[in-house]
């Protein structure tokens, strides 16, 4: 699935941002743990200049667990444009972690956060409280068609 998103650090207070976001359709608040993995033997899953071109993620979202393979696309200047993601649900977080380890993937980073999700007609808007890093706002549009200009979609966001 092709998605286009914009992620920015939030400098305002959480309650001030939530007051503004509450005019949209509130979907819910979820605790999310993301563990990103890399493979020392595969160039695509190694950090390059502080960026990943591809990554493998294990996510715990409330009581559900998911594995995701994500491919990021960048413009000629190295600016992230969009991602393609393949994701599926898995049952057992602990067993999945062991399988990933047996495959030789190494944990790169863990991101522990609380996500407040809102919807509009076109966008998913998420206020993220990231442990140790602060507040972030993500605005995402999914299901981008092949004929749409990614830069124009991103500019509209």
Name the predicted role of every residue range.
Residues 70-72, 132-140:
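Residues forming anionic-ligand binding surfaces in small-molecule and nucleic-acid pockets
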Residues 146-157:
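Mixed-charge, glycine-accented linear interaction segment located at domain edges/termini
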Residues 124-132, 142-144:
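An amphipathic alpha-helical core segment
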Residues 7-9, 138-142:
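Active-site ExK catalytic segment of metal-dependent nucleases
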């Amino acid at each position: 699935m092709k998605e286009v998103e914009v992620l920015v650090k939030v400098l305002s207070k959480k309650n001030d941002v939530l007051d503004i976001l509450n005019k949209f359709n509130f979907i819910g608040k979820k605790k999310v743990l993301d563990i990103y993995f890399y493979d020392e033997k595969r160039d695509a899953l190694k950090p390059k200049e502080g960026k990943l071109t591809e990554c493998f993620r294990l996510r715990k979202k409330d009581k559900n667990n998911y594995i995701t393979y994500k491919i990021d696309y960048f413009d000629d200047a190295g600016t992230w444009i969009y991602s393609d993601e393949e994701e599926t649900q898995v049952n057992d977080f602990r067993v999945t972690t062991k399988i990933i380890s047996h495959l030789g993937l190494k944990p790169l980073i863990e991101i522990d956060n609380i996500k407040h999700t809102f919807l509009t007609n076109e966008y998913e808007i998420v206020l993220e409280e990231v442990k140790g890093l602060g507040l972030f706002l993500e605005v995402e549009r999914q299901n981008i068609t092949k004929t749409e200009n990614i830069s124009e979609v991103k500019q509209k966001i």
